[in-house]
């Protein structure tokens, strides 16, 4: 708002270091992303995604933390639309990248786990199922981003009662 901008212009900040240091976020997350050196086929990208999922699980285990939600974003390469056949067969949404080139819209999805975990097997299975569900097998992959949401330490997760569904 204008009042904050005017105060800032005059060198007065209403937010002090005390407020900044006392801030505690409501939730935490870890994110890992890769821009691939060249366009990957879905088969090759699948291997990279599995490695990223296993790495995320090992990071959680190392930090004694758990997650119950995974978010995967797959960015496609402009080469996916470079030849005439690809442009005519692709029926999805097309966006423009930072360089003004046409590129297929990224794929994005979320997988919710039944309970908080740091199990490499459970996380990998969920991420691979999500990958298979959201990715277009006819396009070339250029960017991959995996985020673990709702990250808490193991002790906090053990103390938090799980919700029960009554039918």
PLM region descriptions:
Residues 1-167:
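Basic, low-complexity intrinsically disordered segments
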């Amino acid at each position: 708002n204008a009042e904050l901008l005017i105060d800032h212009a005059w060198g007065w900040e209403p937010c002090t270091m005390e407020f900044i240091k006392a801030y505690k976020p409501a939730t935490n997350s870890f994110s890992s992303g890769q821009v691939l050196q060249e366009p990957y086929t879905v088969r090759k990208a699948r291997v990279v995604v599995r490695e990223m999922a296993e790495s995320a699980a090992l990071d959680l285990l190392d930090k004694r933390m758990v997650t119950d939600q995974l978010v995967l974003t797959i960015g496609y390469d402009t080469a996916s639309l470079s030849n005439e056949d690809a442009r005519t067969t692709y029926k999805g949404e097309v966006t423009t990248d930072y360089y003004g080139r046409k590129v297929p819209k990224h794929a994005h999805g979320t997988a919710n786990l039944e309970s908080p975990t740091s199990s490499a097997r459970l996380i990998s299975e969920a991420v691979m199922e999500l990958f298979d569900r959201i990715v277009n097998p006819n396009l070339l992959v250029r960017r991959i981003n995996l985020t673990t949401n709702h990250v808490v330490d193991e002790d906090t997760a053990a103390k938090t009662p799980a919700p029960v569904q009554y039918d």
